[in-house]
Amino acid sequence: PEALRAAITPRTKLLILPYPNNPTGAIMNRDELQAIANVIRETNIMVLSDEIYNSLTYGPDRHVCFAEIEGMKERTIVVDGFSKSYAMTGWRLGWAMGPKEIMRHICKIHQFGIMSAPTTAQFAGIEAIRTGDDDIARMRDQYDLRRRFLLGELRSMGLDCFEPEGAFYIFPSIESTGLTSEEFCERLLHEQEVAVIPGSAFGASGEGHVRISYSYSMNHLREACSRMRKFLENLKQEQK
């Protein structure tokens, strides 16, 4: 809360909260959200809460919508979509919820700037809502297995790794290799044909890390980890 309070200036109009988080997989529990809300109440700031990974959490703390926090419903715009929960990436179908006056302006911009989502995507979204909840549960269980597998593998390689509790990404530190995140990714791709994302793509604070997605099959993840382990072993030999 103190860091947030210190970052707010008279020019601050909006706080963006993306959680569960991409790239770290971090979530926010009710106490943490309440602490943020306490700071927001001291200001006139609105909150844009990006909760597109809300169905994909794995620890004891389940997702809490920021608008549920007392006094925040009138100050919050929630954005969500079908891409992650229903595995509909590419359909580009989502929604927003917020105070009536703000939504009126959002609808105007959307109506005359974007028109509407394709009809086929809308029908697919309707069917997902009607019949897809069991699939979400099965998918979440599979993601959890992959998450725990990947966390164990990366740590066994000697990489420091924050345990993700949401989304489907893991964000290990690669500082011990002596490479920048871009160098690491380029070499891993060219030498072992494994693609990961440099942490620098997410800003200066992401440097020294790489983002790995576990939205692939266990067979793909096992093979990727085997190749990544070989890459790190070769790198150690090279640096001796």
Language-model features: locations:
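PLP-dependent class I/II
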Residues: P1-K240
